[in-house]
């Protein structure tokens, strides 16, 4: 295979793209990146986005995975124009319901001589390669290409059932990739390949191009891992056009690999590839989609943060880079934090509540079902917390102490390390100063003024040593929402009880 740059073709006028996952596991970031780029191309060109399911592998496919894929797309806001659950002119949109279509096309290919019956077993193919001095992994050798009817009958008499193979032409196969430019496969580099198993089951090598042809897909955007199958599909497409099944050859674009830790290709089994794990940790869809868009594409050289509307306006698959892209969790989290900060305060709260309920911090999983006090505290806390969290899963750690009415919060290990030898004296001085503050004056500014005078000006403590123990008393954490605002939210009784509680434990 050879690649030549600067030969990327123009897109057709009425773009039709598709997303066609197999339901074989939990949705992963590579799958979502494929869906996102196809969706963005369709929306940018005002084309059509088709969503179908490739579920012909009964051993690996599951209904649970099928439902998870739909759940993932719905959560991300990736909608489709034709396909699963919305219908369209070319259904059904699950391959498991299209068996008769594949049988009919396979029969036409066989009758026209584009496909042929192959009786060779894998063991026989390997033995012939070894005998001829070829590597065991050389692949199929074309042995069955020109079997006579007598030879076929003899194999059938032995109880053998044939697979169907496509007859590859003895010529180079080339195409202009939308991302990589001109790609050429030399004659003989791709052996005749199976499209129907001996038991009659159609393979991906048949079902995928047939579905694309019958659904009039004219732009195929998919992962680099499928690049080696493209010459097979191009040849099959030529045959389908001859048979009247397809009208035209689609354009192909192969997106770069997504790499994980250690510069290895990101695997479905790698934790960072699990879409729902990222959702559970508190990624919002805007942040995750923004980051996934950067895996091979950029909106501008000096800009990483953008909305999906902005992506749609600018996206062109021909701008996608061919080089592998690395999934950097830290950068993804950083971009997610930017999008969290851009949420309207009430939207931030609405999205945070399910995480707060999951973590046992509030009484219900929706804003409207919360108690009046919970809503009051969260509304006051939102402007303090929203700029400081990177993931919605971090909100509970920030607001838990504000919602709690406990008089003493056990400090976590990190917070305990911040308590120096001066902590008892600092707490004694803080308790004495704050005890004199009237309920009506228990406000952020007066609390700051009171503690600053008692601890810094009169006590001579540096701010970190002065306010650190007070912060630990209020939240049990080293990092928390702004201290004086937090003290106002919890109120004098709770704040004083926490200060005294920590002092008693030192």
UniProtKB/Swiss-Prot annotation:
ATP binds at residue 268. A motif ('KMSKS' region) lies at residues 265-269. Its main location: cytoplasm. The keyword Nucleotide-binding applies. It comes from the Bacteria. Catalyzes the attachment of glutamate to tRNA(Glu) in a two-step reaction: glutamate is first activated by ATP to form Glu-AMP and then transferred to the acceptor end of tRNA(Glu). This is Glutamate--tRNA ligase. It comes from Bifidobacterium adolescentis (strain ATCC 15703 / DSM 20083 / NCTC 11814 / E194a).
């Amino acid at each position: 295979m050879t690649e030549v740059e600067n030969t990327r073709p123009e897109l057709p006028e009425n773009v039709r793209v598709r997303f066609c996952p197999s339901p074989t596991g939990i949705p992963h970031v590579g799958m979502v990146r494929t869906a996102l780029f196809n969706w963005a191309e369709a929306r940018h060109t005002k084309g059509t986005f088709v969503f179908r399911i490739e579920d012909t592998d009964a051993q690996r496919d599951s209904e649970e995975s099928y439902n998870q894929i739909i759940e993932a797309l719905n959560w991300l806001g990736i909608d489709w124009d034709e396909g699963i659950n919305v219908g369209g002119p070319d259904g059904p949109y699950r391959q498991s319901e299209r068996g008769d279509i594949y049988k009919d096309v396979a029969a036409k290919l066989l009758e026209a001589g584009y496909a042929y019956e192959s009786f060779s077993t894998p063991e026989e193919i390997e033995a012939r390669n070894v005998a001829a001095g070829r590597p065991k992994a050389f692949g199929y050798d074309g042995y069955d290409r020109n079997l006579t009817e007598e030879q076929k009958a003899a194999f059938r008499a032995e109880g053998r059932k044939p697979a169907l193979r496509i007859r590859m032409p003895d010529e180079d196969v080339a195409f202009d990739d939308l991302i990589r430019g001109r790609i050429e496969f030399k004659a003989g580099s791709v052996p005749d390949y199976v499209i129907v198993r001996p038991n009659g089951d159609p393979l991906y090598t048949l079902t995928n191009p047939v579905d694309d042809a019958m659904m009039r897909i004219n732009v195929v955007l998919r992962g680099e891992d499928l690049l080696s199958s493209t010459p097979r599909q191009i040849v099959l497409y030529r045959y389908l056009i001859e048979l009247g099944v397809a009208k035209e050859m689609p354009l192909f674009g192969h997106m770069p690999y997504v790499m994980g830790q250690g510069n290895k290709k990101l695997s479905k089994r790698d934790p960072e590839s699990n879409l729902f794990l990222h959702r559970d940790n508190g990624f919002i869809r805007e942040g995750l989609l923004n980051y996934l868009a950067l895996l091979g594409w950029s909106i501008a050289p000096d800009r990483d943060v953008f909305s999906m509307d902005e992506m749609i306006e600018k996206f062109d698959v021909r701008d996608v880079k061919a080089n592998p892209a690395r999934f950097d969790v830290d950068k993804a989290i950083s971009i997610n934090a930017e999008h969290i900060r851009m949420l309207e305060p009430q939207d931030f709260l609405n999205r945070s509540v399910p995480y707060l309920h999951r973590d046992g911090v509030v009484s219900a999983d929706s804003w409207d079902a919360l108690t009046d006090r919970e809503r009051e505290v969260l509304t006051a806390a939102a402007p303090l917390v929203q700029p400081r969290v990177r993931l919605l899963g971090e909100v509970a750690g920030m607001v838990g102490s504000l919602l709690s009415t406990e008089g003493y919060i056990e400090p976590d290990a990190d917070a305990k390390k911040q308590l120096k030898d001066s902590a008892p004296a600092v707490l004694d001085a803080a308790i004495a100063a704050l005890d004199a503050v009237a309920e009506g004056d228990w406000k952020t500014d007066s609390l700051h003024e009171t503690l600053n005078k008692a601890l810094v000006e009169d006590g001579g403590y540096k701010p970190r040593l002065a306010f650190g123990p007070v912060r630990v008393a209020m939240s049990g954490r080293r990092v928390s929402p702004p201290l004086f605002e937090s003290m106002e939210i919890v109120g004098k009784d709770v704040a004083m009880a926490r200060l005294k509680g920590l002092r008693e434990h030192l």
